[in-house]
Amino acid sequence: MRRPIVLIGTEGQVLCERCEIADGFISRGRGLLGRTTLARGHGLLIRPTWSVHTAFMRFAIDVVFLDAELTVLKLARNLRPWRAASRLRAHSALELAAGECDRLGIGVGDRLAWASLDPAR
C-alpha cells in the first residue's frame, strides 16, 4: 500500500484523516481483511474497482463509490460482513467505518479531493 493521504470533502472538511491507498493486486484483494475494526477518521481507497465485498470481515463498513475525478456516484451504508456492493462505471471505492457517511454528510454528487500526509510533497 502507498503512503496514506487525507481526503477532503466538498465543503473543505476533512472526511478521512488517514486514508490508505490499495492500488496493487495484492493490496486490493486483501483490503481490510484481518482487521478487527476501522477507526473513525481512517479509511481505505481501493482503485481501480467498481465493486467490493465484505466476505471474511468482522465488522460493517460504509462504501463510497467514486468516479475518476473523485465525484461520489453511490453510497453503500452499513455494509455488513458477507455482503457485496457495486457501481458500474465507478473508478474507485472508499471504505470507511460504518456510520461515517451519515456523520460526515457525504452525499451523491459530492466532489472529494486529496492531500498528501508527507509535508515534503
Residue ranges with predicted function:
Residues 1-121:
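Compact, glycine-rich, soluble single-domain proteins
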